[in-house]
Structure formats: structure tokens, C-alpha cells
């Protein structure tokens, strides 16, 4: 058994390759280190709120000296030539910009553009009205001294304002143009995992197996070599930000060994049960913590050690040294 408090663990690829059947423990339970193999596809994401800021025939992904995001993706495609590299995109792109995306696919045999509107996420949707109804009913069932009348009246007012055309959690997030838009659909893409590559008519997807896992990387992650075979506790792991003597789970790099990973489904259940749920804090953080039985009694640093995805061939989170490209 591996200790959850470690400096190496599964982020040291050579160590786990020598003992692929090892387990790691957290909160008194052991979890198998499951395989994310060398054929598992890599997914990047670029949701562009202002496509008009690019030149007419330019790929609408930031690519400056300070933020060379497109270069980072094409560099990954060259290094990981045996993996499919997906770019999950959304935005009000022009015909010329979509043509530029198509040219990028032609230039790189293993690169695939995946448009958000082409992917069926309906199995993860819920009516906003149902979310409101559940919370309103819960408030009404409380005794008068514990009922929040102000909240109840506010929820009932907001419920009346939801039209049939707007009665969808997914549709609500699809209209946003902020980080919540980005984060929400990242979570759904990771629920699909490798299957998201089969949601396009592109013939490049024929090598992707149904239900296969996926490796998600933000575009500020720089590959310096092949990732090889990776192992993660129960098949899920993610980047941990370590700055200013604090640690935090980050959604900038996440690996899963299968679609519909139960830790991510736990996060989706939070998104389905709160009117003010946040896709990062609730949809990822709370879901993963709940799945692995993390409680306030546990040491958060130990949990971060347990869940951390780190790799010697990835320079993580380089945009922390610059201003946001958004």
C-alpha cells in the first residue's frame, strides 16, 4: 500500500510502472491505482467570449508571446503523435474561423476540433424549474421558526420567471460568457471523457473506444515529453496548486480512466440540487471530496497529496506567472 502522504506517488511514472497493482489509501479506505494508458486521448478546451478580436482567417485561440496557447497545443500534438488531441471549443465563430479550425485539423493528423454544440450533453441536464421546486418544497416542509420566508419568496419569484425555453441547466450555462461557462462544460466533457471524441463526424475518432478515459489539460500546460502510462486512485486525479504555503485542488489538469466517473457524477448531483451551485467549487471540488469520503475531520493537505496529478513531463499552470488572457 502506498501512503497518501508522499513526494512521489503516481506522479512519478517510473515508480508506478514497476508496481502497477499497488493501492493508495485515504480516510481508511484503499483505492486501486487504475491505468490511464499511452493511447488515452488528451483534451484541451478553448471557449472564446470575443471571437471578433482575432484576424479574419486566424484560428481563434490566443497565441501571443505571453500566452502561446495554440503553440502549446500543437507542441503537444507533435510530442504525443500516437494520441488523439482534442480541442473542445465554443463561441460565436465566423465561417472563416471555422475554416481555420479545419485547416488546423488537416495540418495535424491527430488533432480534432470538437464543437460544444455538436456534443449531446442532455443526459447530464436538469430542468431549472425542478431544482427550484425541490428547494422550495424543502423550505415549506420546515417548521415556521426554521423556514426562511425571504428565501422562499425569492425562489418562488425566480421560478415564475423561468420560461419553457430557458428551463435547462445546460442552456443556462451555454449562454454565459465567463469562467463558469468554461468550468461547467469542462466538467461535462470529463464525464464524457474519451467518448467526447466520438461525438463528432470526424473520421479521426475511429480509434477511440467507447467509455475510454481522458486527460484534460489547460492550454497553459506545456508538455516536454510523452506522458506514457499514468496511474490514478480509482481512476481520477487532478492538479494541485501549491502556492503561498497553501494547497488547493485545481481543474486545470484532470485525468480519468473512464467515462461517467462516479466522483464527477457526485459533483453533477450538487449542480442539480442548488440554484447557486458553482461548477468548480461544487461540481468538481465537493463532488470529489464526497466520493472519497473527505470530511472536515480530515487533513486537507493529505487529501491533496492523495488526489494530486503531477508529471515530470508537464510544466504545470504557466499562466500563474502572467495576467489572465481573458
Curated annotation (Swiss-Prot):
Q: Write out the residues that bind UDP-N-acetyl-alpha-D-glucosamine.
A: 45-47, 69, 216-219, 319, 324-326
Q: Does the keyword Transferase apply?
A: yes
Reactions listed under catalytic activity: L-arginyl-[protein] + UDP-N-acetyl-alpha-D-glucosamine = N(omega)-(N-acetyl-beta-D-glucosaminyl)-L-arginyl-[protein] + UDP + H(+)
List UniProt keywords, sorted A-Z.
Glycosyltransferase, Manganese, Metal-binding, Secreted, Toxin, Transferase, Virulence
Q: Which organism is it from?
A: Escherichia coli O145:H28 (strain RM12581)
Its UniProt domain note says: Adopts a GT-A fold and acts as an inverting enzyme that converts the alpha-configuration in the UDP-N-acetyl-alpha-D-glucosamine donor to the beta configuration in the N-linked (GlcNAc) arginine product.
- What does this protein need as cofactor? Mn(2+)
The places in or outside the cell where this protein is found are:
Secreted; Host cell
As recorded in UniProt, its EC number(s) are: 2.4.1.-
Motif DXD motif: which residue numbers?
218-220
Where Mn(2+) binds, per the record, is at 220, 317, 319
Main location (coarse class): secreted
Similarity comment text for this entry: Belongs to the glycosyltransferase NleB family.
Spell out the GO cellular component terms annotated for this protein, sorted alphabetically and separated by semicolons.
Answer: extracellular region; host cell
- Relate the protein's function as given in its record: Protein-arginine N-acetylglucosaminyltransferase effector that catalyzes the transfer of a single N-acetylglucosamine (GlcNAc) to a conserved arginine residue of host target proteins. In contrast to NleB1, not able to disrupt TNF signaling in infected cells. Shows a lower enzymatic activity than NleB1.
A GO molecular function term, named singly, is:
metal ion binding
Query: Know the name of this protein?
Result: Protein-arginine N-acetylglucosaminyltransferase NleB2
Q: What does the record give as the active site?
A: 250
